[in-house]
Structure formats: structure tokens, C-alpha cells
């Protein structure tokens, strides 16, 4: 009877009491009407979407390094390889400063621009660029170019009027840095170029002043490796007006070749154009020397100009007007507004005069000494005391003293000519 009592509620449903599973049936209408086996497949389909999101982030993580690589490295494998060697380069050189930039990594824009210049100077050859960068870093460590500008001073008689630095602006406000070498201002060739180390330091100091004006350490944009225009380059002007000694002077030849060699190694890709103005015909040897040490990309930037007054014509109107009048512009003379290295007057002549006086002073002193010695002899009172005593002992003493007196006089006589001989 108890089972029959349970059947009435089951009888209320259209299914017989044998089908106890209709209790699960209400869950089926929530899904599409498919086979009864869908109940067992549903847990598998529900687990699949849970695993999918766990696999997707792994694929994204693997793709992140390639996506985060800067374009200037992704598009330039040689530059990327160059940066891979940078830690070893800095370790080998023992120095990390180049042109005011502390070399760091590929995320530092000023560092990237420096690396691009060294790589371009070697036409993309990573090994050659590495060797040159190491040499340049070692050279800067030894030479300390920053100190040559900040603390060193140079002879005004040797280098005064020989080098200048100017900065002009074009129509867009962009600055153009120009270094000037006025070789016609050299007064004494051997004094200016005779000491090669001194001349090179002066020339490096002028170059470093120009490099500072480029402001490479303040760069915020990576320069285009393949672009012809480089915002971190300067102009150089060499004026040979009234120069007639270049053909035969060996000191100038040696200084010029050494400067070209050092600058090609230590300052690659910093030159936009170089103008040789008022050039005499005998200077062919200098251009031949430049081709030996400099690349074709650099020598193609050289422009000889026979008349210096035509220099300003090489530039657009807003810029050429700022050039000095002597070079075809309307600007002031270099001596009036250009900058230069720290020059000081030579104190050497005054020092030499004082040395001569100091050497002569001791020679005069001995001449007076023998004159004073005879004056001291009468001060010896024992000679007079024995005269007052009538004893015979006193006579003996006087005879001994009189015997000693000639010896003292002889000594005075022999010593007197000695100073005279020194004076001669």
C-alpha cells in the first residue's frame, strides 16, 4: 500500500513509475534536443573552454620579445649584433664615454646614434666597427678631450687666430655648427707645428667644442641609418689664404697627417661637408693623404674652392648671410664674434730673464767677500796685548803670530782671484 501511495504522484505524470530518470529530464530542455549521450559529453565540452585561455597567454608571451624589439634593431641585423657586443667592447676599452654620451644599451637613444655612426663609418661591417670603437674609447681615456676644453690653455702666440667655432641658424631654426682653421694666421711655422703633441691637443680641443654644440647627449630620436641627412654633423672650413709653405715644410706635413689619422679614428661620421678655400695648387699632397685614411663616403664631402669669397654661395639665403663678409656673407668677422679655445699669453720671456738674474747674483757675491776678509784681520786684539807686557814670553808669542800672519795673507791672495775667474 505504501508503494501504491507513492504511485499516485507518479501517475500524475505521463510516464510510468519505472522511469525514475524523468527527474533529470528538466535539465535537458536547457540544451538543444540531441541524443541522450550529450549528458556525458557536456562535461568535456565545458572543460575545453577552460583550458583554451590557459594556452593562449603562453603563445602571447613567446611572441612578446619579437614585438618589443625596436624597429631600428629589427630592420638592421648588423646594428643588433653590434649592440650584442657592446658589453665586451666597453670592458675591453675600460671606458664608456663617447662625445659626451655615456654608452649604455639599445634602449638609450644617444647610445644608439653613436653606434650607428661607427657602423656607418665601416659600411656595416660589425667587426671593423667594433675595433674602431674600442680604439676610439681607449684614445679618449688617454687623451681626456673634455679636460682639453675645460681646464687646458694654449699659447696665444702659437695658436691665436688659427681656429674658431661658429653656430648659424637656417630658416627652420636648425643650427649649423662650423669650425674654422685659418692657416694663414700662423706666425711661425716651426713653433706652431713643431710640437706635434701640443698642436694635436689644440686641434682636438677645438673639435670637442664643436661636438658639444651638436648636443648628441640630448638626442630623443634615433637617426635613420639609411638616410642621407644626419642632424648630428658639422661643417669645417680650412682657409689657406697667404699660405705658401705647405710644399716644403716637414713639420706641417707631419702634423696634418697625424691629425687626419686621429680624427678619422676618433670622430667618424661627424662631418657633413668640408670646404678648402683659397687653396693653392701645390696642396695636392694633402688631398692625397686624406684619401689614404678616410673612406669614400667622407672624401666625397670635400669641396676645394679657389676663392674664399664664394663660400657663402654654397648655402641657402638665411644661412649664407650669417657668414663673414670675407667669405661672401654679411656677418661679422671671425675675430669679432666667433669662439675659440682658451688662449693665454706666453710667460716664458719673463721667466728666462728672472733665471738669468738669479744666475748672475751668486757670481757677484763672491767678489765682495775677499774685500771684507782683510777688514777682519785688525780686529784680532791679541796682537796689541803682547806689546804692553815686557816679558820674554810675549816676544815669543809675537814672533809666532807674525809668522802666522803671512799665511793668512797668502790665503787671502789666493782666494781673491777665484771669484774673478768665475766672473769671466
Curated annotation (Swiss-Prot):
Annotated CRAL-TRIO domain residues: 152-335
Positions that bind heme: 183, 203, 238, 240, 274
Main location: cytoplasm
CDD domains per the UniProt record, alphabetical: SEC14
Places the protein is found: Cytoplasm; Endoplasmic reticulum membrane; Microsome membrane
Position of the signal peptide: none
UniProt keyword terms in alphabetical order: Cytoplasm, Endoplasmic reticulum, Heme, Iron, Lipid transport, Membrane, Metal-binding, Microsome, Transport
Reactions that this protein is recorded to catalyse: a 1,2-diacyl-sn-glycero-3-phospho-(1D-myo-inositol)(in) = a 1,2-diacyl-sn-glycero-3-phospho-(1D-myo-inositol)(out)
One annotated GO molecular function: metal ion binding
Cofactor requirements of the protein: heme b
Family: Belongs to the SFH5 family.
UniProt protein name: Phosphatidylinositol transfer protein sfh5
